């Protein structure tokens, strides 16, 4: 795996004169190959030039399309709306007539004469409008599926935003040539078949592989290691230089060792790339925090101050996608229609099982203790109540692109994970602890596989066949029919009892519903608001009323954006070092110490039934 990028038409012409035996003339290559050139050197007004040479076309009329949606996103993207100045030229260089039938589609007559298509691509990061990906009217492309163009510095290439397909030619091979400045490199799971320092050439067997392989170009900030025969590449870009791959590598390596051990023979991934973009959170930068899974990589967006545990939480989820949907999936995913999609019924399976495993493996491998795992599940129960509990998950999944259904999507990470938990417990119970959900995934991967999808309607009957009637009844009642689940009942099977437990509050500036920060009268400074001494975080560091926040762990406070300081105080770890600079009565003061979190009591679970210890330990540890 190499981290470089490609060149454009000019380089093609130069190289063709010097290396004619290796670099064919643009119109004399393999007749079946779609050849794409992406120019990251000559960026025009924050736009990138793309040139596409078609395969041999034998139809009278051809459509060139950009995806309306891509796998794993569950929201309409319409990548074509970021493409402009589309032109078609015949093989002699004369411009041809085109008809743009919608934002994603260009139709060209006299297709056999087509020599190339050329267009400019805008990026998505600096146009995110705050409407959200999953709001009813939101049109923002989820940042990890988006694109970024920062000339000479950084490019995020989710290739669906740059490269389209010719209708009827999805299965044709692609040659993607990318020209880039020599001082930036591309992190990707792809192998560069070119040795030139300014050019990368990637060969892909079909269009779905193009969409499945993101590339991130930036000044080199990478780490590489091997886990159980799997090569892992981490690439990091931070505009402010606040995060580096070397700092994230130890925890990422520790986590991936644990994941490979947890999965055992089910996972046979040979190469895996992690592309981590660290957003400043400013209006012209990525807003959507999270990640998008691919077969051999993950594209992720984080926000400052980003910690290694943020990477672990996100990447642990995405890596488990190598099991589902990447290995076990329905025909709707295998034969994905990028412009007229039919969505699968089984988001609970693809996202819920994955999210559950990303939590379970941590207690299974000793990365967290049992009570911490119980608390994570309890929070999911609480969070799931923000959504419609009686909604059929199969109905929601198949209609997830309906604007009125979109707001239910985040529940796949809450109730979806809880469905997986209850399914795991049910399998453990009937098998007397010998089998669990991971065993079931192994059996399904044997029956199906990356190139052998299942029919949506057969998944639950097949799971019933592999397990027992009670498991099938659970899925029919709670997944298909949407009956609420009695979580207390299922957790009691493994010895847990509901009780009041203290939970850390997620933001140190808010406790018991009280805000402990405010803007001054001119909205130019962010101040501490200390109406009482109940905030343990403030009390421990000696923060006083009307202290002006200047820096938080070395990061400057953006007074124009109150949310930025709230984010700085989010999800901190108890007893970790912290430094806050405040201005108190005209004098800067550095307050140093350790994090003391605020806690709030809530419904949780603890192990209280010793007669269930064996089943409990088989559930958590086997």
Tell me the role of every PLM-derived stretch.
Residues 25-69, 158:
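Early extracytoplasmic/domain-onset interaction patches
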Residues 307-312, 342-350, 404-415:
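Secondary-structure capping and boundary motifs in well-ordered enzyme cores
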Residues 86, 259, 349-361:
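An active-site-proximal "capping" alpha-helix that borders the catalytic cofactor pocket
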Residues 221-346:
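Juxtacatalytic substrate-recognition/specificity segment
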Residues 1-33:
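Bacterial Sec-dependent N-terminal signal peptides
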Residues 358-359, 367-622:
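C-terminal recognition in membrane/secretory proteostasis and scaffolding
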Residues 53, 76-85, 89-269, 287-289:
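Non-catalytic architectural context of zinc metalloproteases
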Residues 33-35, 47-51, 61-63, 114-116, ...:
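Intrinsic-disorder/low-complexity, polar/charged segments enriched in Ser/Thr/Lys/Arg/Asp/Glu/Gln
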């Amino acid at each position: 795996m190499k981290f470089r990028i490609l060149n454009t038409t000019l380089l093609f012409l130069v190289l063709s004169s010097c290396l004619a035996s290796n670099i064919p003339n643009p119109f004399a290559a393999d007749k079946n190959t779609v050849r794409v050139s992406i120019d990251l050197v000559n960026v025009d007004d924050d736009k990138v030039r793309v040139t596409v040479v078609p395969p041999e076309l034998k139809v009278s009329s051809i459509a060139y399309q950009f995806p309306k949606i891509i796998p794993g996103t569950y929201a309409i993207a319409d990548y074509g709306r970021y493409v402009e100045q589309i032109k078609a030229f015949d093989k002699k260089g004369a411009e041809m007539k085109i008809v743009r039938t919608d934002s994603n589609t260009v139709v060209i007559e006299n297709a056999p004469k087509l020599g190339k298509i050329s267009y400019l691509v805008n990026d998505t990061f600096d146009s995110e409008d705050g409407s959200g990906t999953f709001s009813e009217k939101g049109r923002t492309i989820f940042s990890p599926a988006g694109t970024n163009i920062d000339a000479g510095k950084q490019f995020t290439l989710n290739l669906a935003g740059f490269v389209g397909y010719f209708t009827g030619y999805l299965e044709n091979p692609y040659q993607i040539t990318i020209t880039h400045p020599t001082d930036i490199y591309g992190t990707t799971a792809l192998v560069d078949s070119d040795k030139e320092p300014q050019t990368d050439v990637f060969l892909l067997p079909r269009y779905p592989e193009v969409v499945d392989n993101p590339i991130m170009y930036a000044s080199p900030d990478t780490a590489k290691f091997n886990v159980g025969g799997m090569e892992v590449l981490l690439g990091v870009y931070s505009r402010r230089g606040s995060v580096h791959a070397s700092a994230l590598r130890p925890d990422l390596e520790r986590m991936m060792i644990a994941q490979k051990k947890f999965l055992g023979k089910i996972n046979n991934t040979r190469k895996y790339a992690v592309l981590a973009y660290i957003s400043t959170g400013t209006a012209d930068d990525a807003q959507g925090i999270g990640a998008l899974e691919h077969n051999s990589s993950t594209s992720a967006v984080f926000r400052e101050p980003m910690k290694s545990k943020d990477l672990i939480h996100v990447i642990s989820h995405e890596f488990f996608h190598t099991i589902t949907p990447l290995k076990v999936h329905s025909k709707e995913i295998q034969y994905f229609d990028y412009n007229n999609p039919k969505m699968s019924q089984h988001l609970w399976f693809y996202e819920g099982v994955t999210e559950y495993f990303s939590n379970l493996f941590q207690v299974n491998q000793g990365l967290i203790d049992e009570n911490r795992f119980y608390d994570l599940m309890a929070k999911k129960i609480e969070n799931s109540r923000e959504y419609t509990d009686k909604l059929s998950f199969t109905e929601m999944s198949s209609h997830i692109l309906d604007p009125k259904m979109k707001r239910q999507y985040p529940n796949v990470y809450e109730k979806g994970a809880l469905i997986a938990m209850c399914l795991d417990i049910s399998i453990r119970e009937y098998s007397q602890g010998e089998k669990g959900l991971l065993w079931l995934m192994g059996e399904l991967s044997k029956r199906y596989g990356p190139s052998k999808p299942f029919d949506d309607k057969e998944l639950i009957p097949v799971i019933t066949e592999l397990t027992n009637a009670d498991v099938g009844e659970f899925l029919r009642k709670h997944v298909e029919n949407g009956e609420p689940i009695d979580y207390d009942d299922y957790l009691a099977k493994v010895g847990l009892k509901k009780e009041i437990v203290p939970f850390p509050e997620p933001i140190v500036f808010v406790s018991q519903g009280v805000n402990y920060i405010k803007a001054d009268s001119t909205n130019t400074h962010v101040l501490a608001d200390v109406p009482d001494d109940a905030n343990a975080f403030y009390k421990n560091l000696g923060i006083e009323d009307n202290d002006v926040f200047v820096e938080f762990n070395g990061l400057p406070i953006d007074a124009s954006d109150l949310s930025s300081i709230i984010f700085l105080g989010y999800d901190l770890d108890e007893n970790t070092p912290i430094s806050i600079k405040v201005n108190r009565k005209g004098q800067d003061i550095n307050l140093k110490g350790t994090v003391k979190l605020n806690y709030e009591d809530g419904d949780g679970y603890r192990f209280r039934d010793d007669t269930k210890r064996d089943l409990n330990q088989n559930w958590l540890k086997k």
